[in-house]
A protein has these predicted regions:
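Extended, compositionally biased intrinsically disordered regions at domain boundaries
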Residues: 1-20, 64, 87-133
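Hydrophobic side chains in well-ordered alpha-helices
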Residues: 2, 38-46, 90-93, 97, ...
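Structural motif
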Residues: 9-10, 27-29, 53-56, 78-80, ...
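Short beta-strand-to-loop capping motifs
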Residues: 31-35, 81-87, 139-143, 171-176
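A conserved active-site cap/scaffold subdomain adjacent to cofactor or substrate pockets
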Residues: 32-33, 41-111
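Conserved glycine-rich FAD pyrophosphate-binding loop
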Residues: 104-200
Length: 200
């Protein structure tokens, strides 16, 4: 029976079925990093590689306890790189990226799709800062200047993590006055970047 046929039986001679492409998957390669400079190197190489990552972030050691995943077995600072696509393509590209970065198996962990999604949702939502009551800033600089900027502002007792493959520094500072904020702005300006106050 067809709609509007008033009970008349009909024969379908041709049927067109519209299908949607299968939803892509993702995994996250997590690398144990002892040094910020090495982490920035990994981010830079990853974003310019043929593995085509869709996310690249670095968390210092002080935020390590914010992530408790079954698949995350490493300690200390972490660099996380997300790869999206078909399952077979993802695994191949992660292997290729590990070879390009020259990292060993005992230095990495792989977050499977479900845990990978949670990790990146927490990153987008700035969850590591959710229980902190300090001032929150968004710093954007060329990736080549990130290390220098962090070296100069660390005297302000900053808590931070790095997103956008090295160009975005989310920064939390407990106590800051007008003089300190002006100095930080000047440091960032000299690094060809800018600062946005999110909460103060």
């Amino acid at each position: 029976l067809l709609c509007g046929s008033f009970g008349t039986l009909t024969v379908l001679t041709e049927v067109a079925v519209k299908v949607l492409p299968k939803q892509g998957s993702n995994k996250t390669l997590v690398i144990e990093n002892p040094h910020l400079k090495k982490a920035l190197e990994y981010l830079n190489i990853s974003l310019s590689s043929s593995s085509d990552p869709s996310g690249a972030v670095f968390y210092p050691e002080n935020f390590r306890n914010n992530f408790t995943f079954n698949d995350l077995t490493i300690n200390g600072p972490i660099t996380a790189i997300r790869i999206e696509g078909s399952p077979g393509s993802i695994d191949h590209r992660i292997t290729s990226l590990c070879n390009e970065l020259k990292i060993k198996k005992d230095e990495i962990a792989i977050l499977e799709p479900e845990q990978s999604n949670i990790f990146w949702e927490n990153t987008r939502g700035l969850k590591v800062f959710s229980n902190l009551k300090g001032n929150l800033f968004k710093i954007v600089v060329p990736g080549t200047n990130t290390f220098d900027v962090l070296s100069k502002i660390k005297k302000f007792d900053v808590k931070y993590f790095i997103d956008w493959g090295g160009s975005l520094i989310w920064t939390q500072i407990d106590k800051i006055d007008a003089k300190s904020l002006k100095e930080i702005r000047e440091i960032i300006k000299n690094a060809e970047g800018y600062l946005t106050v999110i909460k103060i």
